Amino acid sequence: MSFLFGGNNRSVEGSVDPAKIEMAVAELDMITDVFNRLVNSCHTKCISSTPLNHRYAEGDLLKGESVCIDRCTAKFFEVNKKVGERMSAMGSAAQATGSFGR
């Protein structure tokens, strides 16, 4: 990845596979999407949003908010893992039977 940050001044344009760059960009987009969904979901659930608390009174999270964020994050990743495993199993089963995409 040093070519992205100018670490290697050799002529890298010819040696960089555009398909790999496209896959890396797509992966970064997916990771960013997961992160944004996690932040939005857990913030909405855990950070008090009553009219009196729309402005953050404290610079840090309250203890209850912090615990909620920790639990929400753990649950989010656990569900994400289980969904990924289930989708992988479904894809493998469909591929084995030849019914993928039908």
From Swiss-Prot:
Q: How does it assemble?
A: Heterohexamer; composed of 3 copies of TIM9 and 3 copies of TIM10, named soluble 70 kDa complex. Associates directly with the TIM22 complex, whose core is composed of TIM22 and TIM54. Interacts with the transmembrane regions of multi-pass transmembrane proteins in transit.
Gene Ontology molecular function: metal ion binding
The free-text domain note is:
The twin CX3C motif contains 4 conserved Cys residues that form 2 disulfide bonds in the mitochondrial intermembrane space. However, during the transit of TIM10 from cytoplasm into mitochondrion, the Cys residues probably coordinate zinc, thereby preventing folding and allowing its transfer across mitochondrial outer membrane.
Function comment: Mitochondrial intermembrane chaperone that participates in the import and insertion of multi-pass transmembrane proteins into the mitochondrial inner membrane. Also required for the transfer of beta-barrel precursors from the TOM complex to the sorting and assembly machinery (SAM complex) of the outer membrane. Acts as a chaperone-like protein that protects the hydrophobic precursors from aggregation and guide them through the mitochondrial intermembrane space.
Q: Where does this chain carry the motif Twin CX3C motif?
A: 42-72
Q: Cellular component GO terms, alphabetically? A: mitochondrial inner membrane
Question: Cellular location of this protein?
Answer: Mitochondrion inner membrane
Disulfide cross-links: C42-C72, C46-C68
Q: Which UniProt keywords apply?
A: Chaperone, Disulfide bond, Membrane, Metal-binding, Mitochondrion, Mitochondrion inner membrane, Protein transport, Translocation, Transport, Zinc
Q: What is the protein's given name? A: Mitochondrial import inner membrane translocase subunit TIM10
Q: Which one Pfam family would you cite for this protein?
A: zf-Tim10_DDP
What GO terms describe the biological role, i.e. biological process, of this protein? protein insertion into mitochondrial inner membrane
The membrane-topology field of this record reads: Peripheral membrane protein
Gene name for this UniProt entry: TIM10
Q: Which family does it belong to?
A: Belongs to the small Tim family.
InterPro entries named in the record: Tim10-like, Tim10-like_dom_sf
